[in-house]
Amino acid sequence: MPELPEVETVRRGLQPFMEGATVVRVEQNRPDLRFAFPENFAERLSGRRIEALGRRAKYLTVHLDDGLSIISHLGMSGSFRIEAEDAQGLPGGFHHERSKNSLHDHVVFHLMRPDGASARIIYNDPRRFGFMLFAEKGALEEHPLLKDLGVEPTGNLLSGEVLAALFKGRRTPLKAALLDQRLIAGLGNIYVCEALWRPGLSPMRAAGSVAGEMDVMERLAGAIRSVIAQAIAAGGSSLKDYIQADGALGYFQHSFSVYGREGKPCRNPACGGTVERVVQSGRSTFFCASCQT
């Protein structure tokens, strides 16, 4: 499933083509994805101007000139394809290959850009686990999907002090705490594994056991911020590749320290250990037992 860096890269890739554009018409090719489309979905969007594209955690938000917002999630296999005069590609690289089969094109947004050029933004989703919902004017922040989300792991909002407060008294493993969207919004399996490796923290360690160690909390917060920032930057680089060579993967998977590297040497030069894989809450966890304690 695409995580925060991939969703942010998708947002940045779509932004030049969607912000300021007018929705000429919408082709809706089925009544539902994971959830049913909102009533009169295509009709309510036609003629509206797109004011801004945003992101909250792993959700894309599209803000229209009448105050209506679209909340979109890519699910397991969703992607947007740009077809325009000056671009053709899949914005946002992800570790797993995505479909380009037009049979799975479920929504097509026909846009007129401010410069008079036209563009089509196509949503493709073979497994149909993504969705698009409406948030009425003034109701976005209180939408059930968004209102309980935690702090964003980007910029300086996530600090050691914030992590310490979130983890205090929690017996859940560190990995589970970091994946809890009510605490930190947008982190997923890949980047949690990578972030825990950098400061040498075991994913099985109880979150509350490190809450009082401020130096550890600062290192973990810094690792989370840097992993996310580097992954976004790598996704941005892959965006250029997608325009030139459709379907190429992003770059960050070449920098994985532990994720997907079971049985391979730890990349900590002072370690000498081997990357292991265990299952936590039904998900694969990759870590080095020698240097992550």
Curated annotation (Swiss-Prot):
Alphabetical GO biological process terms: base-excision repair
EC number: 3.2.2.23, 4.2.99.18
Intrachain S-S bonds: none
A GO term, aspect molecular function: class I DNA-(apurinic or apyrimidinic site) endonuclease activity
Catalytic activity: Hydrolysis of DNA containing ring-opened 7-methylguanine residues, releasing 2,6-diamino-4-hydroxy-5-(N-methyl)formamidopyrimidine; 2'-deoxyribonucleotide-(2'-deoxyribose 5'-phosphate)-2'-deoxyribonucleotide-DNA = a 3'-end 2'-deoxyribonucleotide-(2,3-dehydro-2,3-deoxyribose 5'-phosphate)-DNA + a 5'-end 5'-phospho-2'-deoxyribonucleoside-DNA + H(+)
Gene3D superfamilies in alphabetical order: 1.10.8.50, MutM-like, N-terminal (3.20.190.10)
Domain of life: Bacteria
Enzyme active site: 2 (schiff-base intermediate with dna), 3 (proton donor), 58 (proton donor), 283 (proton donor)
Keyword tags: DNA damage, DNA repair, DNA-binding, Glycosidase, Hydrolase, Lyase, Metal-binding, Multifunctional enzyme, Zinc, Zinc-finger
InterPro entries with a match to the protein in the record: DNA_glyclase/AP_lyase_DNA-bd, DNA_glyclase_Znf_dom_DNA_BS, Formamido-pyr_DNA_Glyclase, FPG_cat, MutM-like_N-ter, Ribosomal_uS13-like_H2TH, Znf_DNA_glyclase/AP_lyase, Znf_FPG/IleRS
Cofactor remark: Binds 1 zinc ion per subunit.
Protein residues bound to DNA: 104, 127, 170
CDD domains assigned: EcFpg-like_N
Cofactor names: Zn(2+)
Annotated TM spans: none
Zn finger (FPG-type) start-end: 257-293
PANTHER family linked to this entry: FORMAMIDOPYRIMIDINE-DNA GLYCOSYLASE
Subunit structure and binding partners: Monomer.
Family, per entry: Belongs to the FPG family.
Cited function: Involved in base excision repair of DNA damaged by oxidation or by mutagenic agents. Acts as a DNA glycosylase that recognizes and removes damaged bases. Has a preference for oxidized purines, such as 7,8-dihydro-8-oxoguanine (8-oxoG). Has AP (apurinic/apyrimidinic) lyase activity and introduces nicks in the DNA strand. Cleaves the DNA backbone by beta-delta elimination to generate a single-strand break at the site of the removed base with both 3'- and 5'-phosphates.
Cited HAMAP family: Fapy_DNA_glycosyl
Protein's name in the database: Formamidopyrimidine-DNA glycosylase
Gene: mutM
